[in-house]
Swiss-Prot record:
NCBIfam families: PRK11783.1. GO terms for cellular component: cytoplasm. This is Ribosomal RNA large subunit methyltransferase K/L. It comes from Actinobacillus pleuropneumoniae serotype 7 (strain AP76). SUPFAM superfamilies: S-adenosyl-L-methionine-dependent methyltransferases (SSF53335). Keywords: Cytoplasm, Methyltransferase, RNA-binding, rRNA processing, S-adenosyl-L-methionine, Transferase. Residues 46-157 form the THUMP domain. Its EC number is 2.1.1.173, 2.1.1.264. It catalyses: guanosine(2445) in 23S rRNA + S-adenosyl-L-methionine = N(2)-methylguanosine(2445) in 23S rRNA + S-adenosyl-L-homocysteine + H(+); guanosine(2069) in 23S rRNA + S-adenosyl-L-methionine = N(2)-methylguanosine(2069) in 23S rRNA + S-adenosyl-L-homocysteine + H(+). It comes from the Bacteria. InterPro entries: 23SrRNA_methyltr_KL, DNA_methylase_N6_adenine_CS, RlmKL-like_Mtase, RlmKL-like_Mtase_CS, RlmL_1st, SAM-dep_methyl-trfase, SAM-dependent_MTases_sf, THUMP_dom.
Amino acid sequence: MTTQITYFATAARGFEEMLKTELEQICQAECKVAQGGVHFTTTQRGAYQALLHSRLASRILLPLVTTKIFSDLDLYATIVGINWAEIFDPRDTFFVDFNGTNREIRNTQFGAMRVKDGVVDYFERKGFARPTVDKDHADIRIHVYLDRENMVVSLDLSGDALHMRGYREDTGKAPLRETLAAAIILRSGWQKGTPLVDPMCGSGTLLIEAAQMQAGIAPQLHRKHWGFNAWKGHQQAVWKEVLEQAYLQQNEEIQPLFFGFDLDHRVLAKAKQNARNAGVAHLIQWQQGDVAALKNPCPEQVGTVICNPPYGERLGTTPALIALYSVFGQRLKHQFSGWNASIFSGEPELLNCLRLRSHRQFKAKNGPLDCLQKNYQISERAVAEQQADELKFEQNAQVAPDFANRLTKNIKKIEKWAKQQGINAYRLYDADLPEYNLAVDRYDDHIVVQEYAAPKNIDEQKARQRLLDAVSATLYVTGVETNKLVLKVRQKQKGTNQYEKLANKGDYFYVTEYGAKLWVNLTDYLDTGLFLDHRLTRKMVGQMAKGKTFLNLFAYTGSATIHAALNGAKSTTTIDMSNTYLNWAEQNLELNNLPLRNNRLFQADCLQWLAECRERFELIFVDPPTFSNSKRMEDSWDVQRDHIKLMTQLKRILTADGIIVFSNNKRGFKMDFEGLAELGLQAENISHKTLPLDFERNPQIHNCWIIRHIEN
């Protein structure tokens, strides 16, 4: 058994050097790092030891043939030429893992099929029974790697991938692979025999892997099925010796210095069961708790805090995550002075919310996600800085002090005015500072942060970090609960994308505006159901509507209709192309106890409806989109190009003393006064009168006009 054979251990990208060190320690192998793994030369006993003890390897492969192929015929000939009868019995099932392509073999499925054909044909030509393919529980797994013309055919000695330790029956959301968890621990700097705390432990993988390391429990000690069980070269006696030695190496006399916390008691129950399955239940203390109340379970010792907190791809929403990471950083500095911390995250920007300086960092993949692990020393200096920060109001404003100061100033001015006005939905910040290109709106006790799309010349990562900083500052300055802060990315509208649904939460609540109650939805659509900049326009329309027949075109959710009806309009007619928003308008009418018999709703293309309308109206409010090319409309619409065409139709249904209130959001809009005059209409620009205090910093957000018949 002293024959030296070169095997290949596969690993996740970035872990190759760590795996090399591990294999050298496990079986004193001669190792050579390659992309995606390590070639290691050892005895068969050494290979068994690697299979049993490696925490980082994904698979251990025994190369059978290394050759060059240029076509599928070359591939087939190579496979048929292997003496499979010396490797496994045809009565055993097999499966083919095929990785890689070249010019002739362009997909892995085809490559696997040709390998399967070659294996089956080999046995049939030798007069053996045809072996069966089993995808899920194969006795033998054949691994083929193809890189251009270079091909390696191997026997997979692992069977199932080695990250499948067998102890994890069930998981919470977004679990870590055990091999990744082991790598995180090894990179964390944690020393065996010192405390290890995971404040958001989930299903417990990090703590279980670390506890097994300290207890000397081989990660595959309880695995029953191996890829070598049906291999004819398997040495059962040697394997038995390796297994017995692994049992003897276990250290049962160690202190229980592992502590897991999680807010979810159901996930914690799964973690406890996983620990029992892994044989380390007696080493880990579990406790349900919020990270905001985290306390050091071993204040008299120095240890390591290790954690894989939630991030955007995993759980939660960004505002909640910013708050979570911020409070986590505070608790680390409060409770773990002198300790080390190692935090792994799929959103590196969130790690900045910890407000700690890292001394080492590592890149890694968690599935398709690019992740970052940062190591910190929680020094006395960091703790002192934290305590000093808490004496100042600016403790969170330090994140984005200019933004926080401006937001605070705006709040003092605007909220007093809003209370006097009788409104509880208004804008607090609107890209006042160019480096914080976003808007902050209040809807009663909710806050909406809308990020405007950054210019192409702005670094995406820098823009993302500024957004996170601004959200963090907004949470602190406003005092809003994290679950009541909504974050949106607003881009330049194209066509009718304001109608596209973003979510399906169905969370509606109403806000008040000059006596009107209006439903809003902050999560499901790009817009909320209420254009805040048109607040004074709606108020004015309501005052003008008393005793008049009122038409609301491009009505959106009908908020102007509500003001008109509440102020005594003789009748209202509301037109919009979207059934969703028309239903919303109906709900607004019901909320204000306004009967449908006097307030009609029609779903229609507004321009087409106008062309067919035979009624006349005394007051018309029209707020068309800047541009639209909806499939429901016969032609595209451009407000600059087509507004005279629209006025031509409106004049026809306007009473002799009637008024059109025309508004749009096109910056730089130019009214065609000559075209209006030819129609016998005149326009007065009242934009400055319809700009509320909370939008005075953005005077071009809309333009508004009063249009009448020219007096004879």
